[in-house]
Curated annotation (Swiss-Prot):
Oligomer and partners: Interacts with RAM1.
Primary gene name: TF80
Pfam families: GRAS
Region feature (VHIID): 100-165
A biological-process GO annotation: regulation of DNA-templated transcription
Protein name stated in the entry: GRAS family protein TF80
Main subcellular location of this protein, as a coarse class: nucleus
Length: 438
């Protein structure tokens, strides 16, 4: 790997006991999968399984989940095999809640986001009597408990606080309601909690319990990128879509490489890096509809936290390349701050990071939800949707610095375009930006 490679930093990471770096065969294996050299990829995956481990160092753990995803990528084009491998898998609400809790506890990213979001709400709603927060993924009570405690001390008394929490998991909303109403009762705080059981893309903004006079704040933490998921076939003309169906019917007459190549071509059509495609116009109808619906609420504040990576429209090999860079930093920060024997760490890596990696590599079209984009792309998208940026609080930045230092000196943040980027060893991982209705 030359010094210009995005992987030069991996040389500093620990190798396994045999001195082998599993990153190298993984990258080669990914190229084989993308080109359709399945037998070679199979040999590579066999070798990788011998030098990687979900219980090893950070690189070994990450490579384990990337190699697993590559394996699923291969078998997904054999529908019967793929369904058989996944037929017994059950997603429990309790597991989802638990792994989010691990992410909150072991890494500072969610705490950072919540701190900055709450400070922005406090400052923008300073004189409002009725504050209505719409949480697009209501799952962590600590954020709003902290806000309730702070607003209770507001000079002149607290506002009437409404929180409309959106989550497709009923259990998550029930837990949120219990914790928030309990805290409000203890503090004698005026609170109304409105649970909305819904997928993000199905939220009916017109029927949300927003009343005239409500000062609206919207909080979106790692949610909006899922709305970038689109049907790749729909981007092509209807004639092309029909032709693809005819070609699919003759799969036996085509090579596996050709079949994979179709995925890569479709992905390129949607690429925000492509000169053939505007940044997002037409690429994601769901995103455009959703942003327009939010704008109609005329929010006084909209705070967005997103992954700082570019994994939306690129082809398979570029996607893997960029995902290795992003997730390499996440696994490294866990390796540096959490013991290898931690059960919580193992579950976080397997149930959250591993599943995200699998979605990025294995899935295409509407099934690929992990379509991260960089801050500059979100800025352009939000501006075009009719929002203007709100500078983030100085007080919030001071508190955020103290928060990050409690985890590790390698955590830091930097300012960019009136937004904040939280970093690990100078590598931006998440962005936080604040907006308002124009």
């Amino acid at each position: 790997m030359d010094s210009g490679s995005p992987y030069h930093w991996l040389r500093e990471l620990r190798y396994d006991s045999h001195g082998s770096n599993p990153m190298i065969p993984l990258i080669e294996c990914a190229k084989c999968v993308a080109s359709g050299s399945i037998k070679t990829a199979d040999i590579g995956l066999e070798y990788i399984s011998q030098i990687s481990s979900p219980h090893g160092n950070g690189v070994q753990r990450m490579v384990t989940y990337f190699s697993e995803a590559l394996g699923y990528k291969i078998v997904k084009h054999l529908p019967g095999v793929y369904k058989a491998l996944n037929s017994s898998k059950i997603s429990l609400s309790s597991d989802d809640i638990l792994v989010q809790k691990y992410f909150y506890d072991l890494c500072p990213f969610l705490k950072f986001s919540y701190l900055i979001t709450n400070q922005a709400i406090i400052e923008s709603m300073e004189r409002e009597k009725v504050v209505h927060i719409i949480d697009l993924h209501c799952s962590e009570p600590a954020q709003w408990i902290n806000l309730i405690q702070t607003l209770k001390k507001r000079p002149g008394g607290p506002p009437f606080l409404k929180i409309t929490g959106i989550n497709e998991k009923k259990e998550a909303l029930e837990q949120m309601s219990f914790h928030l109403t309990t805290e409000a009762g203890i503090l004698d705080f005026p609170l109304q909690f409105n649970p909305i059981i819904s997928k993000l893309e199905d939220v009916d903004f017109e029927n949300l319990p927003v009343k005239t006079g409500d000062a609206v704040a919207i909080s979106s933490v790692l949610q909006l990128h899922s709305l970038l998921a689109t049907d790749d076939e729909m981007v092509s003309s209807s004639g092309a879509a029909s032709f693809n169906m005819q070609r699919a019917a003759h799969l036996g007459q085509r090579t596996f490489a050709e079949w994979l190549e179709r995925d890569m071509i479709n992905a390129y059509i949607l690429s925000p890096d492509s000169a053939l495609s505007p940044l997002f116009l037409g690429a994601s109808p769901k995103m455009g509809i959703f942003l327009n619906a939010m704008r109609k609420l005329q929010p006084k504040l909209l705070v967005i936290t997103e992954q700082e990576s570019n994994l939306n429209g690129c082809n398979l090999t570029e996607r893997i390349d960029r995902a290795l860079y992003f997730y390499g930093s996440l696994f490294d920060c866990l390796e540096s701050t959490v013991t290898r024997t931690s059960v919580e760490r193992q579950k976080l890596e397997s149930m959250l990071l591993g599943e995200q990696i699998k979605n990025i590599i294995t899935c295409e079209g509407v099934d690929r939800k992990e379509r991260h984009e960089k801050l500059e792309q979100w800025i352009q998208r939000l501006k075009m949707a009719g929002f203007v940026k709100v500078p983030l609080s100085y007080n919030g930045r001071i508190e955020a610095t103290n928060l990050l230092q409690r985890y590790s000196h390698k955590y830091k943040f930097k300012e960019e375009n009136d937004c904040l980027l939280v970093c690990w060893s100078d590598r931006p991982l998440f962005s936080v930006s604040a907006w308002k209705f124009r």
